[in-house]
Amino acid sequence: PIGSNYNKTVQLCGEFYRPPLPFPACRADDIECLRRGLRTFFVLMDSGHVGMKPIDPFLVNSVAVALPDEQMSILLRRANVTGVRWTKLVDRRFNGGKSGTTFSSDLHVTGEINVNMANRVEPFVAFLTMDIDQVESNITYPWHATKGIDNEDYILIGPERIAIRNFRTPTFFLQPNTEDTIPIDNFLLSKPSILDHMSNEITAALMHSVMDNFRLFASSVIHYYSLL
């Protein structure tokens, strides 16, 4: 299977050798080829290639939203996120020593939502299921090439900047159907910006983890396999 033999580097007759990865040979402007390469990258990531961490499912410990004017706060706890492995490459840009990538994702989120109000001792609590459709992640990062001990060129990735854009307001439903769910449901329906904020925070955390994996991948695999 992919990932079982590709993590191994051996030395033959004084030369370092790593088995080739199943990547297509892509030109920088061949977006369809790059999309196929991205799919392979996610397969390798799921398999733990070169120490990468699988991120589907992905756990976000908490997302907090403070609303001082309403004297309330919202906390989404232990959000479980799935669907990132089907992320699509929308655009790829090069600008000197910087690269830009735009992803589109459809994500499914579940977690416990707590709504705390100043006039209540106990929070409203419910289980939230949320679908984030067509969320776009615009990622830019600096990079430069370096020589490895095998005299091959590898890529070092600098800190990324991530901007998230929602094309659709996330949809949701709450469980179970109790007295607590009614005020939470009414509040989220009246303030869709809260859903957008939670969606952006979750997607940004997820994409930072994708970039952490790509950073490890790019520094371990010779440069012409770099596709992000």
Identify the residue ranges that each predicted region occupies.
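Tubular lipid-binding modules of the TULIP superfamily
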Residues: 2-130, 142-150, 154-156, 228
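Short, low-complexity, Pro/Ser/Thr/Gly-rich segments in the mature regions of secreted, periplasmic
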Residues: 213-228
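Extended amphipathic ligand-handling, pore-lining, and cofactor/metal-binding catalytic surfaces
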Residues: 144-215
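Envelope-exposed proteins and targeting segments
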Residues: 105, 135-137
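Short linear sequence motifs
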Residues: 10, 51, 134, 207-210
